[in-house]
Amino acid sequence: MKKIKVLIVDDSAVVRQTMADILASDPQIEVMATAADPFIAAERMKSDVPDVITLDVEMPRMDGITFLQKIMSQHPIPVVMCSTLTENGSETAMKALEYGAVEIIQKPKLGTKQFLEESRVRICDAIKAASQARLRKIPARPHAVAPKLSADVILEKPASRAMIQTTERVVVVGASTGGTEALRVFLESFPADCPPIVIVQHMPEGFTRAFAQRLDGICRISVKEAADNDSVIRGRALIAPGNRHMLLKRSGARYYVEIKDGPLVSRHRPSVDVLFRSAARYAGKNAVGVIMTGMGDDGASGMREMKDAGAMTIAQDEASCVVFGMPNEAIKRGGTVKVLPLESIAADVIRHCS
């Protein structure tokens, strides 16, 4: 199998070495070279073109955003932005996604053995997802494998008492690589009084708040990073915070979200499977499930449970996906009622909920 060639661009020698060590631990990935700044990287790329570039957000001589714009406007290559967990770093990382970056990862740092292993899994998975991404030109402006746990580790056993019936529709959405742009298109299409929407987008801790704030500023609906016990109400979308699972719950006729810790599920935290399975349990036929672009199979099993519970389920089609992984797995497992292009999904959801 051909290895994924990666060019690491970061002004910190420590980060470059740490990233190189992490990526070298995966047999599917090869570190082609490292560079301390974009000028060195550009020279290196004249003789060998990488499959994926990891790019620091803030560097001397030329910042990551400027270099990203040059790459995407001339010879697009999948770029994974590597950012520190700061307010400025998060905002810049969101801008990078608009300019064509396909993933954001948090810079590796010291921590517990479990933290380091989860960080390794996330970084290597981000590289693999990026290598599969479909890009477009954008004008300048052997190691231990993390166990693939099911959502059973997060979901408690179902309550035995019957719940009060409700007819309120609720929309649950899962996305990964390419999902930030897909969610923008999706959410911008809704009127201010849309059905409640609950979203899991695979994204590191700290970046989801900036992402939600950016969407809130451009959409007619309200968008916020979810907090534990937030009510699920019309006209608002809740986005799961990075590194926390989010479940849809119900008390009487009131929907709300529960935010909780727990192990990686389907290699992710937050996990789409956790959200979808909770929607199958607590919303049943009143739920609408949407699975969007992304690598892997997170959400595929949960979407099948939703369909079996009577929910309307929609997968984004291959042509409009950046990576046709998660939707394809949901289709293969018989979990989808419809397969639609991205631009048609919101209108279909609105029709179904009206």
Curated annotation (Swiss-Prot):
InterPro entries cross-referenced by the UniProt entry: CheB-like, CheB_C, CheY-like_superfamily, Sig_transdc_resp-reg_Me-estase, Sig_transdc_resp-reg_receiver
Enzyme Commission designation: 3.1.1.61, 3.5.1.44
Location of this chain's protein in the cell: Cytoplasm
Pfam families linked: CheB_methylest (PF01339), Response_reg (PF00072)
CDD domains tied to this protein: CheB_Rec, REC_CheB-like
Domain CheB-type methylesterase: 164-354
Domain of life of the native organism: Bacteria
Modifications made to the protein after synthesis: Phosphorylated by CheA. Phosphorylation of the N-terminal regulatory domain activates the methylesterase activity.
Enzyme class of the recorded protein, top EC level: hydrolase
Gene Ontology terms describing biological process: chemotaxis
PROSITE patterns xref list: CHEB, RESPONSE_REGULATORY
Gene3D superfamilies: 3.40.50.2300, Methylesterase CheB, C-terminal domain (3.40.50.180)
Gene Ontology cellular-component annotations: cytoplasm
Residues with 4-aspartylphosphate modification: 56
Catalytic activity: [protein]-L-glutamate 5-O-methyl ester + H2O = L-glutamyl-[protein] + methanol + H(+); L-glutaminyl-[protein] + H2O = L-glutamyl-[protein] + NH4(+)
Residues of the active site: 176, 202, 298
One Gene Ontology MF term: protein-glutamate methylesterase activity
Keywords: Chemotaxis, Cytoplasm, Hydrolase, Phosphoprotein
Chief site of localization: cytoplasm
PANTHER family: PROTEIN-GLUTAMATE METHYLESTERASE/PROTEIN-GLUTAMINE GLUTAMINASE, PROTEIN-GLUTAMATE METHYLESTERASE_PROTEIN-GLUTAMINE GLUTAMINASE
Role played: Involved in chemotaxis. Part of a chemotaxis signal transduction system that modulates chemotaxis in response to various stimuli. Catalyzes the demethylation of specific methylglutamate residues introduced into the chemoreceptors (methyl-accepting chemotaxis proteins or MCP) by CheR. Also mediates the irreversible deamidation of specific glutamine residues to glutamic acid.
Domain notes: Contains a C-terminal catalytic domain, and an N-terminal region which modulates catalytic activity.
Family named by the database record: Belongs to the CheB family.
This protein's name: Protein-glutamate methylesterase/protein-glutamine glutaminase 2
Gene responsible for this protein: cheB2
